[in-house]
Curated annotation (Swiss-Prot):
Pfam families: Thymidylate_kin (PF02223). GO terms for biological process: dTDP biosynthetic process; dTTP biosynthetic process; dUDP biosynthetic process. Keywords: ATP-binding, Kinase, Nucleotide biosynthesis, Nucleotide-binding, Transferase. This is Thymidylate kinase. HAMAP family: Thymidylate_kinase. It comes from Paraburkholderia xenovorans (strain LB400).
Length: 206
C-alpha cells in the first residue's frame, strides 16, 4: 500500500481551525474509505500519552522561552516516532491540529526566539519531513481576540496580547509564502459554508 498523506491545520488561537477539524476528518474518511485506509486525528502539543501529560505543563505553567521550544520539539519527535510515521507507513492518512509551523509562529514570531535556533531543531527532529498539505486559517488578530474572549479558562497562550498574535500571524504568513506548494490559506472571516466549500476543494485534489 502506498504511503499515506499528512495534513495539518494551523492558525492563531481564535481563528477557527479547530471548529472545522471534525468536519474535515469526516469528509476525508469518506474519501479514503474505499481504499481500506484510515484517518488518524492527532494534535500538538500532545498526540501521545507522554505528549498529553506534558501538554498540560506547556499550556499552563510559565517557563523559560528556550525550554518551551525544546519541549515542543521533544514532544514532536515522540509524536513522529509513535504516531505519525507508523500511520503513514501503513498507508493511513494523518490529520494534525498543529505541527512545526506552530512552533515557528508562536515561539519564533510571537515570543521572538531566533529562527536559526528553531531551524536547527527542525532539522534534527524531522530531517526534511513536512506535511503534504498545511491548511492555514488566517484571521485578523483583533477579530480573533474577540472570539477568544468567550473562552472559558484560557491557557497561557490564549491569554497573550493582540500584539503577540499579530507577530504570530505574520510568521505564519511568512512560512506560507516560503512554501506555497504545501500551504492553503483560508480567510477565517468567511462564513462556515464558504470555508467548507474551500475545504471540499482541497480534499478533492489530495
Amino acid at each position: 500500500m502506498a504511503r499515506g498523506k499528512f495534513i495539518t491545520f494551523e492558525g492563531i488561537d481564535g481563528a477557527g481551525k479547530t471548529t472545522h477539524l471534525s468536519w474535515f476528518r469526516e469528509r476525508l474518511e469518506q474519501k479514503v474509505a474505499s481504499t481500506g485506509r484510515s484517518v488518524v486525528m492527532t494534535r500538538e502539543p500532545g498526540g501521545t500519552p507522554l505528549g498529553e501529560q506534558i501538554r498540560e505543563i506547556v499550556l499552563h505553567q510559565k517557563m523559560d522561552l528556550e525550554t518551551e521550544a525544546l519541549l515542543m520539539f521533544a514532544l514532536r519527535r515522540q509524536h513522529l516516532a509513535e504516531v505519525i510515521e507508523p500511520a503513514l507507513a501503513r498507508g493511513d492518512w494523518v490529520l494534525s491540529d498543529r505541527f512545526t509551523d506552530a512552533t515557528f509562529a508562536y515561539q519564533g514570531g510571537g515570543r521572538g526566539l531566533p529562527r536559526d535556533k528553531l531551524e536547527t531543531l527542525e532539522r534534527w527532529v524531522q530531517g526534511g519531513f513536512q506535511p503534504d498539505l498545511t491548511v492555514l486559517f488566517d484571521l485578523d488578530p483583533e477579530v480573533a481576540s474577540e472570539r477568544r474572549s468567550a473562552a472559558r479558562d484560557p491557557d497561557r497562550f490564549e491569554s497573550e496580547s493582540e500584539a503577540f498574535f499579530s507577530r504570530t500571524r505574520a510568521e505564519y504568513l511568512r512560512r506560507a509564502e516560503e512554501a506555497p506548494y504545501r500551504f492553503a490559506i483560508i480567510d477565517s472571516a468567511q462564513s462556515i459554508a464558504q470555508i467548507q466549500r474551500r475545504l471540499e476543494e482541497l480534499i478533492a485534489i489530495l
